[in-house]
Amino acid sequence: MSDKKICAITGSNGYVGGCVKNYFAVRGWEILELARQPKPNSRAIKFQLGEEVLPSAFENVNALVHCAYDFKPLRWDEIRAVNVDGAKKLFQAARTAKIPKIIFISSISAFDGCRSLYGKAKLEIEKIALESGALVIRPGLVYGDGSGGMFGKLVAQVRKSSVIPMIGDGSQIQFLVHNEDLSVFIERYASGEIQISPQILTAANEQPWPFKQLLLEIARSFGKKPKFIPLPWRLIWAGLKSAEMCGLKLNFHSDSLVSLMNQNPKPDFSENSQAGLVCRPFEIERLKV
């Protein structure tokens, strides 16, 4: 049997999960991927959110990082059945298997009074995670060299065009976290280097970035001065919602727009320093975009 520590990760095919997986591998962990379509030549088990998980799948696993979230369900009953109940089954299996460290990757979009179904689902999962003895982390907008995810899409949009649609007035506040800072903290907790009790932590630098200012900063790195075309967000939401009701498959959902337009104005960063969670300020000059 290998002496390597084993980390089970869900959502490793996504941007955040992939960053976490890669960092754990660099730190010498053996990775057990839980995925709908396991990649060839990887240690993996077939995993579908919402389905039962056998505790035996976690034999000798030292840590579980739950990053997966299924965006396909659009109605609350479907979201709850897949993502919330699915997380409950996963955490129950992890507890039965006596996994020492469990980490749930929530979202800064999850907060009391949030309006998006995504945020509400994450809140429900947070409660289950805490009851299961998990550490809950709410990352802000995750970025890094060669970024994927939402930040990568923003970079691609600014790079390809000098005319950028602006949903609303661009005043929506974003809090950012470098993928390395996020991954380092998760690994330090999983390895036992950081000893803290199960709690909720917001993983982001405390500097607020208005959405428009963030796009201007990205554009500046390309030497561009973009022109913004304002679009009323409720009109865009209505169009997205209508398309969804017609059964069209979209890359950006109406609920994601609700989340973007209704962020937490005052995330709680009060416990970060004591917990050892350090998030660098966003500096576009230091990125390879």
Give the label of every model feature segment.
Residues 85-123, 131, 135:
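Conserved Rossmann-fold NAD(P)-dependent oxidoreductase catalytic core, especially the SDR/UDP-sugar
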